[in-house]
Amino acid sequence: MIQAGLRIDVDTFRGTRDGVPRLLDLLDEAGLKATFFFSVGPDNMGRHLWRLARPAFFWKMLRSRAASLYGWDILLAGTAWPGKPIGRELGPLMRRTQAAGHEVGLHAWDHHAWQTHVGVWSAQQLGEQIRRGSDCLADILGQPVRCSAAAGWRADGRVVEAKQPFGFRYNSDCRGRGAFRPRLADGSPGIPQVPVNLPTFDEVVGPGLPREAYNDFILERFAAGRDNVYTIHAEVEGLLLAPAFRELLRRAERRGIRFRPLGELLPDDPRSLPLAELVRGRLAGREGWLGVRQP
């Protein structure tokens, strides 16, 4: 049996409204549980269109055929009008996810703002963004939030420090192999991190890898004897690619791959996890910096 953590990022209003119910049905059909990370504040994701001036982002959007993949309502959200408040309007879907037995955590208050400004925010601004998101999701769920995942994996040592006071059991803020405890500025261990170590659909699909070949590509990258942490998006696998994701789950089962929530990958005693740094780095297929485990 190959153990794998399944992380589902929910970035937008439409992804929550339309993608999450479809994914809940698919996971129920497969008898699987996962971790859902919700964005709960305003949906301003369409403001990323200004990044088209950057060649790397333009190429990524072109390579993944973003307009057909996401739809124009997602690509334009929050541009000419205020972004819809995701948590306020769609909180019942977050409670439904929790009631179905899935792990639920915080992705962001404002996904676009986090990806765009996290690198320059002050410690106070970082804390305020986390607090707003955590308080909103806790009110929706009726219980404290126990885990989080930085939007776009935009995290570094400052983000690690900012999350310390919130009582999360773990965070999934970076890319890399194997759960670890990030080293804080004073040298002490921080809240455990569960990194993602498998590529996402939008990072690899393009001229060299057609959509139809993606399931073959990704299934070959799961391996026994290590943490496999895989991320999908409600806006992709919960919408246009839902049939392909359903087939991926079927094929994964035949290969002995068993998906589970990320929290179940942690040892009973987190003190047994190694210490490592969480630093800024680069990853093929992504535009800009993101958090990576080092070493």
From Swiss-Prot:
GO molecular function: hydrolase activity, acting on carbon-nitrogen (but not peptide) bonds, in linear amides
InterPro entries documented for this protein: ArnD, Glyco_hydro/deAcase_b/a-brl, NODB_dom, Polysacc_deacetylase_ArnD
Biological pathway: Glycolipid biosynthesis; 4-amino-4-deoxy-alpha-L-arabinose undecaprenyl phosphate biosynthesis; 4-amino-4-deoxy-alpha-L-arabinose undecaprenyl phosphate from UDP-4-deoxy-4-formamido-beta-L-arabinose and undecaprenyl phosphate: step 2/2; Bacterial outer membrane biogenesis; lipopolysaccharide biosynthesis
Catalytic activity field: 4-deoxy-4-formamido-alpha-L-arabinopyranosyl di-trans,octa-cis-undecaprenyl phosphate + H2O = 4-amino-4-deoxy-alpha-L-arabinopyranosyl di-trans,octa-cis-undecaprenyl phosphate + formate
Lipid metabolism among keywords: yes
Similarity annotation: Belongs to the polysaccharide deacetylase family. ArnD deformylase subfamily.
Name listed for the protein in its UniProt record: Probable 4-deoxy-4-formamido-L-arabinose-phosphoundecaprenol deformylase ArnD
Organism field: Pseudomonas aeruginosa (strain UCBPP-PA14)
Gene: arnD
